[in-house]
């Protein structure tokens, strides 16, 4: 439900508009949890299309409850629905010759990259960065930008240490019992703080 990804307005399909079937919103998320005046005005009509509604953040639930007559449930992130063993079975071997510190730097934080470099140096590990942001210059020797979901989780499973600016980076560190460091995420860090 983050409108900056959908042209600064809600995608009606996410709210079941125009679908000829039952529509359920499971574990919708919005980070940061804030609505503009236009979004607050548009959302009640869109929410009427849904047969059931759940969100990941308690803050989001409180924000949208006044906008709908439907019950708004708070549920866990879908990543947490699988156990360690279920995630582990999906993993594949990562082709790395040396132990590595994984830096999942979703927020493009220089502090995150700096912490990863320092931790790598301290542990004698190379630093592998996963980012969705195309970089013109790589901050480290290994910067991965196009991983499929299985490779993505496999890098967490095989890491020596994880440094992250992401909720899902935090979750996979916990699931795979990895030592980790979460770099401050400001007002986007509520879910990570709640998890920890």
Report residues per predicted region.
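Catalytic binding pocket for nucleotide-activated donors in carbohydrate/polymer assembly enzymes
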Residues: 171-196
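Short hydrophobic/aromatic-enriched beta-strand-loop microsegments
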Residues: 70-78, 126-129, 179-186
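Catalytic donor nucleotide-activated moiety binding site of glycosyltransferases and closely related
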Residues: 24-32, 63-64, 105-106, 111-148
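Conserved donor-binding/catalytic core segment of Leloir-type glycosyltransferases
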Residues: 94-107
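A short beta-strand/loop micro-motif in the catalytic core of glycosyltransferases
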Residues: 50-57, 163
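Aromatic- and Gly/Pro-rich donor/ligand-binding loops
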Residues: 1-45, 92
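Donor nucleotide-activated moiety binding/catalytic core segment of transferases
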Residues: 72-80, 84, 132-133, 137-170
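A conserved, positively charged/aromatic
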Residues: 44-48, 156
């Amino acid at each position: 439900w983050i409108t900056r990804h959908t042209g600064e307005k809600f995608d009606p399909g996410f709210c079941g508009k125009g679908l000829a079937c039952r529509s359920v919103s499971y574990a919708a998320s919005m980070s940061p949890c804030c609505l503009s005046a236009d979004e607050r005005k548009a959302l009640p009509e869109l929410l009427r299309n849904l047969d059931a509604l759940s969100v990941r953040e308690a803050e989001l639930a409180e924000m949208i409850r006044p906008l709908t007559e439907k019950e708004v449930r708070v549920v866990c992130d879908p990543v947490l629905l699988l156990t360690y063993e279920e995630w582990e079975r999906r993993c594949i071997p990562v082709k790395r010759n040396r132990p590595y510190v994984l830096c999942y730097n979703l927020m493009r934080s220089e502090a995150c990259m700096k912490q990863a470099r320092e931790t790598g140096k301290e542990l004698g590990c190379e630093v592998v960065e996963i980012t969705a942001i195309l970089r013109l210059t790589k901050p480290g020797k290994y910067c991965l930008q196009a991983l499929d979901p299985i490779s993505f989780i496999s890098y967490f499973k095989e890491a020596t240490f994880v440094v992250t600016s992401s909720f899902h980076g935090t979750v996979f560190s916990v699931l795979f019992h990895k030592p980790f460091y979460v770099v401050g995420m400001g007002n986007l860090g509520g879910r990570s703080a709640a998890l920890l």
